[in-house]
Every structure is written in structure tokens, then in C-alpha cells.
Amino acid sequence: PVSNSFQVSSTMSNLNGKVWEQYVGANASLVSSDNSYGIALYQSYRNRNPYDADNDGFSELGKLNMNTFGLRSYYRPTQFSRISLEYHTTNEFRRGGNKFDLQPHETDITEQTKHIINSGGPTYDVFFNEYRHKLSVYGSAQHTDRNSDYGADKNANAYGKTKDLTAVGGAMYVGN
């Protein structure tokens, strides 16, 4: 971020008088007067009930509930160095099919996913030779927790689960 700012937005929509969808989002940036530190934040929320366009009991648009949040911050300990930190998270639930009041394996057909994703990492930058050269040392990690059901005909074995952790680290030198 390079300046202080704040924004909030919200929408509410309706599909053919049947289903409501809500969205709320916000962004903020805060920067010190000498630009030695700053942070940018974002958030969003979206919610939609399932939509059955032709009244056959099956959704054309599935149920959706999503929350996201993230930030990027920096601190300049000296004129020629910067420490940055990022963090992002997503929590999302989606479900399509029919009989939404029942468990997924009790329906005729269900496609359902639930994701919780967390990621982030630090970076350290050092600038040399009047900013013509830069050395960056960085790391990041992401954890994904996913539960799913892709089943038909009341299949109790259609559930899936994934847990994954990924990490990356490295260094990069750039010179002009």
C-alpha cells in the first residue's frame, strides 16, 4: 500500500424471485507517514441459497457460503531493506443436487465441497547499489483441508477428505 484508504461494498440480489444472494466486501490500507511500515487488508463474504430454475427438485446453482480474509504488511527497518508478511484464508462451502435438508448420502444426488485454506509467508528484501540490485529471501506455506461428497443414489461411500500442506522457500537475486 502507498496511501491510507478504506472501502466497504455490499450487494443483495434475487434470482427470479426465488433465491437471495448476499455479498459484503471490505478493503483497508494503512501506511505510516514516512512509508516505513504499512498493511493492506481485505475481507469478503458471500452467501447464496440453492436455485432450482425449472422446479424439478434439483439445483441449477448450488448453495454457497464463502468467507475470505487476507493481509499484506511490510516494515522497512532501514532505507535499503524491507520485511513483508502475507496471510490469506478461504473458508468455502458449496452444495448442489437435491434434498438439501438431508445429509449428502441420503439424497438422490449431491455434489458438495467444504474447503478451509490458510496460506502465508514472509519475505526479506535487501537493496544494493542505489536500488539497482535486490536480494530476496522468502518462504511460504499453504494448508488445505477439504471435505467432499460426489454421490448418487444414497451412496454412503462417496465422501472424500484431503489434508495437504505445501511449503516453499528460496532466494532470488536481481541486478540491472
Spell out what each predicted region is.
Residues 1, 147-149, 167-176:
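Short, intrinsically disordered, charge-balanced linker/junction segments flanking boundaries
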Residues 4-10, 24, 96-98, 133, ...:
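One face of beta-strands
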Residues 4-8, 37-41, 83-85, 133-139, ...:
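Transmembrane beta-strands of outer-membrane beta-barrel proteins
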Residues 31-36, 75-79, 126-130, 174-176:
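Outer-membrane beta-barrel strand-turn architecture
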Residues 48-68, 76, 80-135, 141-165:
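Flexible loop and strand-edge segments within Gram-negative outer membrane beta-barrel domains
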Residues 4-6, 22-26, 67-71, 116-122, ...:
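Hydrophobic, lipid-facing positions within transmembrane beta-strands of outer-membrane proteins
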Residues 1-55, 62-69, 80:
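Outer-membrane beta-barrel translocator/receptor signature
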